[in-house]
Regions:
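Accessory interaction regions appended to the cores of large information-processing enzymes
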Residues: 149, 158-160, 164, 168, ...
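Short hydrophobic beta-strand that contains or immediately precedes a catalytic carboxylate
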Residues: 78-80, 255-256, 442-443
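P-loop NTPase catalytic nucleotide-binding module
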Residues: 1-20, 38, 107-312, 333, ...
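Amphipathic alpha-helical transducer elements in NTP-driven molecular machines
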Residues: 6-9, 22-23, 45-48, 59-64, ...
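A short acidic-Thr-Gly-centered motif at the start of a beta-strand
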Residues: 5, 67-72, 244-250, 431-434
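Short, surface-exposed connector motifs at secondary-structure boundaries
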Residues: 73-75, 99-101, 126-132, 248-253, ...
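Gly-rich Lys/Arg/Thr-decorated short loops/hinges at beta-loop-alpha junctions or inter-strand turns
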Residues: 46, 72-76, 96-102, 216-226, ...
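P-loop NTPase switch module centered on the Walker A-proximal segment
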Residues: 1-105, 109-111, 204, 218
Length: 718
């Protein structure tokens, strides 16, 4: 392969819902560029993308795959992406290096949940969108309905460049209103005839061309003046206006294809090289300090790693985009993210698992390298002495959690190592050990997402694991005032132990004044605050500790021990062993022994006095509540609402959004285990959701009773 200059490079990401036909479109693009001699199929398991065993088993894309084609003296880098929201991390990391996104839409269904979700991510990253309406050869295809759904979801900027003449099982002809030609295709080879538009289609084509001209002119003042002067635009002027509009997301062109029959691929490729921007025409990228950095070959060399993966027999592969300058084989660079030195020993153009060695890559190109020592996803490499660090990619909040445990105890250490490696490949996979719950917790985007990781652990690394229901990080608190005193006394010959502590506990309420007196158990206790310690607890909430000792009944040197005893019990709450929070404790009296009193005595006295007071202070268990936003088709709204209500949710609001219904609800975390699977089952995979932590709230009485009983049984078993 020759070296391509920046102006002859195009970078596209193929987006779309599962089953829309992205992978087969990529096959057709590579076939037209003669990168492959024949097109593969999903059923035959011989596509260039989807080459991993797990993808072939599932017959769908699970990972992003970097590809390329060479077409009319241009290199088009193509990134094929998964269509399931479970693998949104791969979609986002593909959008970053892409300059244009091609949204493949199944003409049987129109806008699907993946179309909507990935469209939002393209919008957030300000990436142009071209719609490729696919599967027009299907007998259930409905182009008009698909177009209408696109306009509902993406607005009036959706503009036809092409429309099908005969969508359905006999589909073989497209009318293009940019070139004002009809293209008729023969078989599935991509061969076509370029014909004049039939008379019976001319009025429709002319009307649509006029709309395209007006939309193109609206994006540029000089073109608008030409349009007013001449009443029309030439084909080249239209391309200029569309190019400007694409960059500004002021136009979303619509193309017609059948990737299965290779219909429309050449026209789409022509549009990509003639209208879509080259990397140097794209808006500047941002560095971590907010500076803008243009893609320019004359600048010092830099690259950004958007994907890291591990391939059998090869090791770690880093996929990158050349952000500036040019990268040459055996080039020494500096990792601006961690200050490490790296040598880019080899450069490759990549098409799935196939790699072609290259001597250099120019600004804007996409390639891969191996054997970097300490460079991962989101890292920047730059020329020595020219430190540049690009802003990291950002990913959605996690929305699925499970506990994970190696079946063989000896694999536990290896398990952590390989999951951390998985996180480097897919930043939406997160693992942590919860000291509180005493579980290894695994977080991701859905059950299917983490099941793929489970398969990889077993089949690639020979680690068999179990997924367990994750425990819930409950909290404990109190709702009323209570008093307790406790004497710790131990005598067994020699020096003994003695400490007595009197305390009052009450709920912490922000802004409430310090205590002066308490009325408790028909007794008035006057308080004189001598010292106050306000502790922001690691697990959330507060502890306010008051020293109210007068007359030296407890020496001040023992107060830290009392506080330590209280904190120990708050770390293992009196009700269920969960963290306690939002409590005020006033130690106002006690007793010492001149010989037997020591720190351990007062720690134990403080711990037990607190425990006893807590249990009579209206103790409550609190549970984490998440705000959940569900995007669901209208016909499934009732089922989803009913399911949410069965999960003890509170519906905050409902709204219509771009052809979907949006439900916002507050749902206990305990009710969200495997929700992604349940939602998929309820809606046949047509809905999605996201969630974020909201607050802790008291559990209902019946739930508290169940939790107390379960904790009691668990304690007996131990």
């Amino acid at each position: 392969m020759k070296t391509y200059s920046t102006d002859h490079i195009r970078n596209i990401a193929l987006l779309g819902n599962t089953g829309s036909g992205k992978t087969i479109l990529a096959e057709s693009m590579m076939f037209e560029g003669k990168v492959i001699e024949r097109r593969g199929t999903i059923d035959a398991k011989n596509t260039v993308s989807d080459y991993t065993e797990i993808e072939q088993q599932n017959q769908r894309s699970i990972f992003s795959t970097v590809l390329y084609t060479e077409y009319k003296d241009h290199k088009i880098n193509i990134i094929d992406t998964p269509g399931s929201d479970d693998f949104v991390g791969a979609v986002i990391s593909s959008l970053y290096p892409a300059d244009v996104s091609i949204m493949v839409v199944n003409s049987q269904y129109g806008v699907e949940v993946g179309t909507e979700i990935f469209g939002r991510h393209a919008e957030r990253l300000h990436k142009p969108i071209i719609f490729a309406v696919n599967q027009l050869d299907h007998d259930k295809s409905n182009f008009d309905q698909t177009l209408e759904s696109l306009k509902v979801s993406f607005g009036s900027k959706v503009t036809l460049v092409q429309y099908p003449v005969n969508a359905g099982s006999d589909f073989n002809a497209i009318i293009d209103v940019l070139t004002m030609k009809m293209y008729r295709y023969k078989g599935d080879t991509g061969e076509r005839e370029e014909l004049d538009i039939p008379a019976e289609e001319m009025d429709k084509a002319a009307e649509l061309q006029n709309t395209l001209i007006e939309t193109a002119a609206e994006n540029d003042e000089s073109l608008m003046e030409m349009f007013f002067d001449k009443g029309t635009l030439t084909e080249d002027e239209m391309r200029q206006g569309i190019r400007i509009g694409l960059l500004a997301r002021g136009i979303f062109p619509v193309f017609c294809i059948s990737s299965k029959r290779n219909i429309g691929t050449k026209r789409l490729l022509d549009f990509i090289i003639n209208v879509c921007p080259s990397p140097d025409k794209m808006p500047a990228s941002k560095t971590i300090d907010g500076k803008e950095f243009k893609c320019n070959v004359s600048e010092p060399a830099s690259l950004f790693v958007f994907k890291t993966s591990v391939e059998p027999h090869i090791g770690e592969i880093n996929y990158f985009k050349v952000m500036s300058g040019k990268i040459t084989e055996a080039m020494d660079m500096v990792n601006s993210t961690n200050d490490g030195k790296e040598r880019v020993s080899q450069l490759f153009a990549v098409a799935g698992k196939n790699r072609q060695k290259l001597p250099e890559l120019m600004a804007g190109d996409i390639g891969a390298t191996v054997k970097l020592k300490n460079t991962k996803t989101n890292h920047t490499l730059s020329a020595p002495g020219k430190s540049i660090q690009f802003a990291s990619m950002t990913f959605p909040n996690i929305k699925y959690r499970t506990a994970i445990k190696a079946k063989n105890e000896s694999d536990t250490e290896k398990l952590g190592e390989y999951i951390n490696r998985a996180h480097q490949e897919d930043p939406t996979i997160i693992v942590e050990y919860s000291k509180e719950l005493k579980q290894i917790l695994l977080f991701g985007q859905g059950e299917h997402h983490l099941n793929i990781l489970k398969w990889q652990l077993l089949n690639l690394y020979k680690i068999d694991v179990d997924f367990l229901a994750p425990k819930i990080p409950y909290r404990e608190t109190i709702t009323k005032l209570a008093q307790s005193d406790y004497r710790h006394k131990k005598q067994s010959g020699g020096a003994g132990q003695f400490g007595e502590v009197h305390m009052v506990v009450e709920p912490y309420i922000e802004g409430a004044p310090d205590p002066k007196k308490y009325n408790v158990n028909n007794k008035e206790i006057n308080i004189s605050v001598r010292g106050k310690e306000e502790i922001n607890l690691e697990w959330g909430g507060k502890l306010i500790f008051y020293n109210c000792i007068v007359g030296g009944s407890i020496d001040t040197r023992f107060l830290p021990a009392i506080l330590k005893g209280i904190m120990e019990k708050m770390e293992e709450g009196p009700l269920t062993g969960s963290y306690a929070r939002d409590i005020k404790v006033a130690v106002y009296d006690g007793k010492m022994h001149p010989v037997d009193s020591n720190e351990i005595s007062f720690k134990l006295a403080g711990r037990n006095a607190f425990k006893n007071a807590f249990k009579i202070a209206g103790p409550k268990i609190m549970e984490p509540i998440y705000e959940v936003e569900v995007l669901v088709p209208s016909d499934k709204m009732g089922d989803v609402m009913s399911d949410l209500q069965n999960r003890r949710s509170i519906i905050l609001g409902m709204d219509s959004e771009k052809g979907f219904e949006k439900i916002i609800a507050r749902v206990p975390l305990a009710e969200l285990h495997k929700y992604s699977t349940a939602l998929s089952s309820l809606t046949s995979g047509r809905a999605t959701y996201n969630m974020k932590f909201s607050s802790y709230e008291q559990v209902p009485a019946d739930v508290q009773d169940k939790l107390l009983k379960a904790y009691e049984e668990e304690s007996e078993d131990e």
